[in-house]
Curated annotation (Swiss-Prot):
Family of this protein: Belongs to the class-I aminoacyl-tRNA synthetase family.
Residue ranges of the region described as Disordered: 290-309
Highest taxon in the source lineage: Bacteria
Pfam families from the UniProt entry: Arg_tRNA_synt_N, DALR_1, tRNA-synt_1d
Entry-linked SUPFAM superfamilies: Anticodon-binding domain of a subclass of class I aminoacyl-tRNA synthetases, Arginyl-tRNA synthetase (ArgRS), N-terminal 'additional' domain, Nucleotidylyl transferase
Listed Gene3D superfamilies: Arginyl tRNA synthetase N-terminal domain (3.30.1360.70), HUPs (3.40.50.620), Isoleucyl-tRNA Synthetase, Domain 1 (1.10.730.10)
Top EC group: ligase
Descriptive protein name: Arginine--tRNA ligase
PROSITE patterns recorded: AA_TRNA_LIGASE_I
Keyword Transmembrane: no
Species: Anaeromyxobacter sp. (strain Fw109-5)
Lineage, opening ranks: Bacteria, Pseudomonadati, Myxococcota, Myxococcia, Myxococcales
Biased composition regions of type Low complexity, renumbered to the chain: 298-309
Enzyme Commission number: 6.1.1.19
């Protein structure tokens, strides 16, 4: 990467100056970033500002000295200019050939271009989706799935060893409610009149499970006590729903390396071992809510106690119960959290931190992709990890805001098929996998997303995924035209590349070469939307360049063989970056596209 080369030159210069006693060794890291205004150069370096205090020198004076040392170590003359600016930044302008050789590496590396080793040697578990196995996936789950898959893909491209994990909530009240819903439908199949309770599951899939159980067991469970049929009906229902969820995920091309069962967490003894571990570390005690005084000796905030009691109410716990409480307030949480109820059963939080305890033993870092409504849950998990001897920084939570589904600007709230919330499958069936995946990434995950079904179906340039894919197809057709004109797609030629001198061509070169840095930064920030933004902005720059060339006569293919070779190579590098970026996001990069709006795909190239 070009940026890495700038960093290396500055490190050499700083080390040489320190060895000669002109300034102390730089212990902290310094930044190398592209300035917002290209007039200020290719990169701005803050090394002098970081080192100034230790060196006992004004940052600008130190910057001048460092710049001189960088010039001295730049034996290959890769830097065309260094200028001290502002409070002590060093603005760097690279020699043109540095950018052109970097462009050559795009094609040389091909499908691997953009991969880095930022995370080499580090194991990460990315847990995403983890929708309760009580029904098919809705569009909110779909956004979680696509964002989570984008995060894991970015981390793989950055060199991390990634495990994709789905936590199956197949233990507890919700799956028991599902089992009872199936049993009611099972009774219906024998002609009985039943009333579905308000919290039951009404979907057609419940009837399917009931029908399968009837076919296999007849009326065996019709009048049997609940204790005899509950586990069977629960397991069959969960198995069936997980099958539906897997199909939904395959529809958007998402697979997991591991499906981690909450039930297995209990059956394997992991939860019991975890509780013993907490007791041995004196991290739990028996008490009541509101919790005892916090670490600073002050009563816990009334609101925090109230919130805790409210949360517990959902698990059937009263504030007056004797509970086994985890000392989470000692680690930054608002209140101590219960891990065991008065009746001896464990809480959801207990299983969740036991699961994170298990994950942390298998990986160096954890990424949880959660709905935005879980934001208040995050401090509890962080406190738990810290109490268990890990670092809060070992856990990163990506929050997913809701999706507002619209059709031509009108809200779509109900499914035509099920009479409930719209399922992910319905959206994918109507607009396609590529549009679904890409549009879910057209906004930050922590911002609400408006998903217009009609826009997603359009084969027009106002559809963001069509716009990017059309750019890739346009490039493919340019090469087809070039072959017809007897101008084969060239290998890298520095002399031909030196003809790429226009401002638009230079801008495209810098955008293309920035691809690996962008991916690495997006991976470390867990933000796959950056890739979608980059693709849209980069192809917009190309469409503008292409259109202007047709208008001015500076077409890609011209009578000037050297210019043609240079421009075709630029197009080849851009096509590779688009394909890699789309592939990383799980979106196809078509070679040909046609719609009434794009029939002149490669005319007058």
């Amino acid at each position: 990467m070009v940026k890495d080369r700038v960093i290396e030159l500055f490190r050499q210069a700083l080390a040489k100056g320190a060895a000669e006693g002109r300034w102390p060794a730089l212990e902290a890291s310094f930044s190398v970033e592209a300035p917002r205004d290209p007039k200020h150069g290719d990169f701005a370096v803050n090394a002098a500002m970081v080192l100034a205090k230790a060196a006992g020198k004004p940052p600008r004076d130190l910057a001048q000295a460092i710049a001189a040392e960088v010039r001295a170590v730049d034996a290959q003359h890769e830097i065309a200019g260094l200028e001290v600016a502002g409070p002590g930044f060093i603005n760097v302008r690279l020699a043109p050939d540095v950018w052109l050789r970097a462009l050559g590496r795009v094609v040389a590396e091909g499908t691997a271009y953009g991969r880095t080793e930022v995370g080499r040697g580090k194991k990460v578990i990315v847990e995403y989706v983890s929708a309760n196995p009580t029904g098919p996936m809705h569009v909110g789950h779909g956004r979680n799935a696509v964002v989570g898959d984008g995060v894991q893909s970015l981390l793989r491209w950055a060199g991390f060893e990634v495990t994709r994990e789905y936590y199956v909530n197949d233990y507890g009240a919700q799956v028991q409610t599902l089992a009872r819903s199936v049993h009611l439908r099972y009774q219906e199949l024998f002609g009985r009149q039943v009333t579905m309770p308000p919290k039951s599951y009404p979907g057609e899939y419940v009837k399917d499970v009931a029908a399968a159980l009837k076919a296999e067991h007849g009326d065996r469970w019709l009048d049997a006590p609940e204790a005899e049929w509950l586990a069977l009906f629960r397991d069959r229902a969960v198995e069936h729903v997980l099958g539906l969820i897997r199909e939904d995920l395959r529809a958007v091309n998402i697979e997991f390396d591991r499906w981690y069962s909450e039930k297995a967490l209990y059956e394997s003894g992991t939860v019991d071992r975890f509780l013993r571990f907490l007791a041995e570390k004196d991290l739990v005690y028996v008490g009541k809510l509101p919790p005892p005084k916090s670490k600073k000796g002050q009563p816990a905030p009334a609101q925090a106690a109230s919130n805790s009691a409210h949360d517990l109410g959902e698990e059937g716990i009263a504030a007056s119960d004797d509970l086994t409480l985890f000392r989470s307030s000692q680690y930054g949480d608002e209140v101590d959290r219960p891990v065991k109820k008065a009746d001896g059963t464990t809480t959801y939080f207990c299983a969740d931190i036991a699961y994170h305890w298990d994950k942390r033993q298998r990986a160096d870092a954890l990424v949880d992709v959660l709905g935005a409504d879980h934001g208040g849950y995050v401090p509890r998990l962080e406190a738990a990890l810290e109490a268990l001897g890990a670092s809060r920084k070992d856990l990163h939570v990506v929050l997913i805001q809701m999706v507002n589904l619209t059709r031509g600007g009108e809200a779509v709230k109900m499914s035509k098929r099920a009479g409930t919330v719209v399922s992910l499958r319905e959206v994918v069936d109507e607009v396609g996998r590529d549009a679904t995946r890409f549009i879910f990434l057209t906004r930050r995950s922590d911002a609400q997303l408006d998903f217009d079904i009609e826009l997603a179906k359009r084969q027009t340039l106002d559809n963001p995924v069509f716009y990017v894919q059309y750019g890739h197809a346009r490039l493919a057709q340019i090469f087809a035209k070039a072959r017809e004109a007897g101008a084969p797609v060239p290998e890298f030629d520095l002399e031909a590349a030196r003809t790429l001198t226009s401002a638009e061509e230079q801008d495209l070169i810098r955008r293309i070469v920035a691809f690996p840095d962008m991916l690495a930064a997006a991976a470390l920030a867990y933000e796959p939307h950056r890739v979608a933004f980059y693709l849209q902005e980069t192809i917009a720059a190309f469409h503008s360049y292409y259109t202007q060339g047709k208008r001015t006569g500076e077409r890609v293919i011209s009578a000037d063989a050297r210019k043609t070779a240079g421009r075709l190579f630029l197009c080849r590098a851009l096509k590779q970056v688009l394909a890699n970026g789309l592939g990383l996001l799980g979106v196809a990069a078509p070679e040909r596209m046609e719609s009434p709006e794009t029939r002149d795909l490669a005319d007058d190239v």
